[in-house]
Amino acid sequence: MMKTRKGHPVYPLTVAQKFHLFYQAFCPKKEVLNIGTSLTIDTEIDWEVLRASIYKAYERSEGMRIRFAKDKEGNCYQYIADKEEREIEFVDFTGKTEEEAADTMQEWTRVPFKFQDSPMNRIVMIRTPDGYNGVYFLGDHMTVDAQSLICFLKDIIELYCNAKYEGVPYPKDMASYLEQLKKDLAYEAGSRAQQRDREYF
């Protein structure tokens, strides 16, 4: 049984994560778990400030730093990396058609994530053919859902605006993924809350 990975405590997968892993094994296209989207605005962007805001958002979000690992028996675990040091790419679609830009981002979305000790999301800063600026985001559904995706992108925007414009407040702290994970695992292990739910339904 794995207890630590790269110096980090490890945790079991939740029921939902196990379910995603189960059906992915039977899908011919492993990118079935990928969620891709883009967020752009018709204004000039300070790319270095945006890049710094993305790194800061990663620092503030445990859920976006999830890594997975398997032990010798094939059991899967998760842990939280200390920080993200990956290069945040910039892609300029100026001179391309809208269709070409969309096709490129769809190709990005079709690439499944590596499972072992690998980041489970990707951010690319983009300029679209019509001059809009922003980010493309790709996440694995084992770690990202619609709500967490929106919260993460919102945090990037608020961090950027705080750094760039006077009078914009610093965003509130992000909720702890680990705290919620521990609650979920306790619930799944047969907590009183689970018993009440079973009796109710």
Describe the role of every protein-language-model region.
Residues M1-P28, R51-E98, P119, K154, ...:
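Short amphipathic alpha-helices and their capping loops
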Residues K3-L13, Q17, K30-V49, E99-D103, ...:
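Gly/Ser/Thr-rich phosphate-binding loops and adjoining beta-strand/alpha-helix segments
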Residues R5, V10-P12, A16, F22, ...:
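Active-site-proximal acidic secondary-structure segment that organizes catalysis
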Residues V32-N34, R86-F90, D145:
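Short small-residue beta-strand/loop micro-motif enriched in glycine and branched aliphatics
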Residues T37-I41, V91-F93, Y165:
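Generic detection of short hydrophobic beta-strand segments and adjacent strand-loop junctions
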Residues E44-E48, K96, T143-Q147:
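A generic structural signal for alpha-helix starts
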Residues R65, T109-F115:
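Short catalytic/binding micro-motifs of nucleotide second-messenger systems
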Residues D103-T109:
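Short Pro/Gly-enriched beta-strand edge/turn motifs at strand-loop
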